[in-house]
Amino acid sequence: MKIVGISDMHGIYEGFTIPKADILCICGDIVPLKYQNYIKSSDEWFINEFIPWCCKQPIEQVYLVGGNHDIFLMNRKYVIDQYLMGTKINYLDNSSCEYSDDTGKVYTIFGSPDCHKFGSWAFMYEPKTELEH
């Protein structure tokens, strides 16, 4: 199985060649920086540019996880899943999907956008102290 992983595209993907693979993992910060604080603009870019770009890549399945600049993805899994319905793109937000290779072997792909708080970004959380675990 061949897996390609990319991140921190910030909307710059034209001219970027993705090699043929089984899985593409896009690990956050997809939205252009100029849209990061605007849900409607981010949604329009996602629907009209990002989804078509992903769908034309030589990849069987795409797994997308949000990043700290992807504010438009926060708390919107249902909406994002509606946009992606019928495509080969799976949005993972503390969730998983199964992927079956051509031999029938099944893999579980898990994705989480969460990261320790370090500013006013998306998907931040306060880490618990060791005593709180």
Predicted regions and their residues:
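Beta-strand-turn-beta hairpins that frame and shape the catalytic cleft
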Residues: 1-4, 96-111
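Core catalytic region of metal-dependent phosphoesterases/phosphodiesterases
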Residues: 6, 11-101
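Binuclear metal-dependent hydrolase catalytic cores centered on His/Asp/Glu-rich metal-binding motifs
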Residues: 105-133
